[in-house]
Amino acid sequence: MSAKTKVSALDHAMQTAHTWVHDVAREFDTEDGEFAYRVLRAWLHTLRDRLTVQASAHFAAQLPDLIRGIFYAGWNPSTVPEMYDAEAYAARFAREANISLDDVGKAAAATTAAVLHHLPPPQMDKALDQLPREIRALLQAQR
C-alpha cells in the first residue's frame, strides 16, 4: 500500500489498518479485503457492545488509530453492556459480517487469531474474560 495522504501519521495509520484486514483475510485464505473488513468490524462491534464502557475503553486503548475508529463507529455507550446470549451474539455477528449463521464460530475464532497477531494474549484475555463463557468460547482462537 503506497502513501496517499502525504501525512506520515495518516499513511502509517492506513497501512496498519490494511495489515489488520489483510491478517483477517489470511486467516480465511482469501484475498477478499471487503469480506475481511466486514468480519473484523463485526468482531469489534459485537465484542464492544457486550463489554462495559470501562472495559471497552481499556480494550480500545490498545488498538491502532483507524481500528479504534472502527471499534467505536456507531457506539452508544448508554446502552452497553448489551446482555445477549451466545445465540443472539452469533445472529448479530452473522448479520453484521453478512455471513451465514453456520460460519460464525469459524469467523469469530479466526478473527480473534488475526487480532492476536497484534495484541498481546493477556490483553485479549482481559477483554474476553468479561464475556459469558458461551460467547467467549465462540471467540477464542486456538493458540
Located regions from the model:
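The feature marks the first
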Residues: 5-50
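Short, low-complexity cationic-aromatic patches
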Residues: 29-41, 48-57, 99-110, 116-129
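Short, solvent-exposed interaction modules
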Residues: 67-121
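An amphipathic alpha-helix signature
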Residues: 21, 60, 86-90
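Alpha-helical membrane-protein topology signature
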Residues: 5, 9-12, 28, 93-97, ...
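Short, charged, intrinsically disordered terminal tails
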Residues: 2-5, 142-143
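Extended intrinsically disordered, low-complexity coil regions enriched in Ser, Thr, Gly, Ala
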Residues: 50-83, 119-143
